[in-house]
Amino acid sequence: DETTGTMGFGIFYMMVNIGGFLGPAMSSYLRTEYGWRIIFIQAAVVIGINLLVVLLFYKEPKVEKGPKTPILTEFKNSIGNIIEALKDKRLTILLILMVGFWTMFNQLFYTLPNFIEDWINSNELSNWLNENIPFLGTLMTQDGQVKPEWFSNLDAFMIIILQVFVSYFVIKMRHLHAIIRGAIIATIGVGLTFYTHNPWFTIIGTMIFAVGEMMSSPTLSSFIAIITPKGKEALYQGTYFLPVAAGNFF
């Protein structure tokens, strides 16, 4: 409901980002020690483990099977259902807004690492880590610089430790206001990450972006759940991924 939905989706989002943090952390170590090829092997192994978990422990709910429909007809029906859902103006406006958000989000992984590699001098931070926290220095630095993926990974780390706290305050806002404010905060954060060559601007900007993400993304899922007509839950929740796809395109 409106009271618990935002918190529930926030907790779900936090759990997703545990994997989002551990994956790059493991890949960072492996690519430094063994080269880039091992990362693809790592990804295949993790996917294989997930598949085994699903096969062994997931039980498909029993549903009554209707008459079989040709694949082409199913495809046409799916497109028609999406168009029908997009006739809901509230949903369409939010999805358009989130296209911009996901376009910004992808810069953390597509553009920012290249910017850090070419323009950010994190030598002082690298030296401090190696002198004071050798374990983190070994894991996070290479050739006198902090590895780019660890700047991006700060986003997932912030979500893990602060999502429940942020969701608690977002509950007190109207859904649309929370989404818009989150998008504005995220925009400020992305702007700061690319503003100067100072690594602290990159760190602070990524942290600010994470706050905006924590406000916007789970709240959108919660809002979609609230406005969804009964019986169309899967259809409306599926439209959540339309701006994700558009953000990857842009």
Regions found by a protein language model. Give the residues of each.
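Intracellular juxtamembrane helix-capping segments at the cytosolic ends
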Residues: 1, 214-229
